[in-house]
Structures are given as C-alpha cells and as structure tokens.
Amino acid sequence: MANSEFKGCWPVAPTPFKSNGEIDKEGMKRVIDCMVDQQVEGICILANYSEQFLLSDEEREILTRLCIEHVAGRVPVITTISHFSTDIAFSRAKLVKELGGEMLMMMPPYHGALMKGTPQQIFEQFAKVGEAGVTIMVQDAPLSGVDLPVPLLIKMAKEIEMVKCFKIECAQAAAKLRALVNEGGEYIEGPFDGEEGITLFADLEAGATGNMSSAMIPELIRPVVL
C-alpha cells in the first residue's frame, strides 16, 4: 500500500535564467515561493524540465543549495541527480544529504542513444546511491531509452532500503503502475504519475498516489490527485 507521505502534487521547478545566460537566483526563489503558495506537497529541482542538461556542475551545486535552503523545510525537496557515472551520482547524493534535502530522483544510467546500464549495473548504481541515506524516487522516463521491467523495480524496492518511490512515465504507464503496485505491495511506497499528467486519470485508477509534472498548473492538478 502506498505511503500517505508520498501523495499529492509534486511539480518540477523550472530554472529561470537572465538574458545573459546566468542563473536568476532571485527568480528561482520566486519560483519556489509560488509553488509553496499553491500548497504543493513537494517540489522537484534539477529535473529534465529544469534544463538540467544546460547546467554546469557549479551551477547545479548553486541551485541545490539555494533551493533547499530557501524552501527551508516548508515542503520536501526532491533533487534530481541522474548521471551515467555512479561516483558522480553518489557525490551529488551526499551533497543533498549534507544540505538536509529529503529526497533524490534518478533515471537509470545512460549516455546518448546506445550507452545504457545493464539491469545489474542499474541495481548497483541505485544501491550505491542509497548508501547516502536519502529516499530515492526512480524515474522511469522514455528519455533514457532504458527498459525498467517491473520485476527489476520490485527487486530494487525490496533490497535497497532507500528506494521507495517510482515515477512511471513510459509507454503503457498505467499498466506498469498497476503491476508495480499489485506485485510490489507495501514496498511501493510512492507510485507517481508523470509525463505532464497526460495519463493522469488512468494512472490514478491504476494506483498512483502522486503526480509530478511541470509547474504550470499545480493548482489545477492537485485537487484531482487528492
């Protein structure tokens, strides 16, 4: 059964930039405040929608610190740390832990169209990141091109203590969510809908307890999810 801790609307914060390409730090704070004011249950940062692929390592660290410190515990912050390198992903996870961040989100390891982790490598990366001691959401997104079969996800949930949540936004998302919830039982604490909520109703019927879309209309999505 899904944990009531992981439910509701958890939008992805966009990253604002100035006209010269620099991060707009004050704008980032306003983005955070806007979402908190809309009573969201949590906020995700540095995700694909947040332009993560345009950010340098230094900019990522600046944003991680700024967002977690500015939210200041008002809602949980999920920090995306996806990387092909397990060492880099683990380093990012440790920073989040040091800053008091509540959650991490990760896609499986991939690079480009052809470099993809095997099921064992995927498991090992998540297991290593789990050693940082921060709750992990697995992002099953089509962007990675990596297949994450339900048995693998359930194995991760059962054997990696910090893997608790699953954002399912691949093709046939509702069917996958249903299988994950039914077969994983109590180990699937946070089954989430994603991909801009285009399958939201089907995903909720399948057992999703939360939604993670962009930050455009959380005030409209939240009442539907709850």
Q: What are these model-derived regions, one by one?
A:
Residues A2-G145:
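Active-site beta->alpha loop and helix N-cap motifs at the rims of alpha/beta catalytic domains
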Residues A132, P142-L226:
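Catalytic alpha/beta core domains of metabolic enzymes, predominantly
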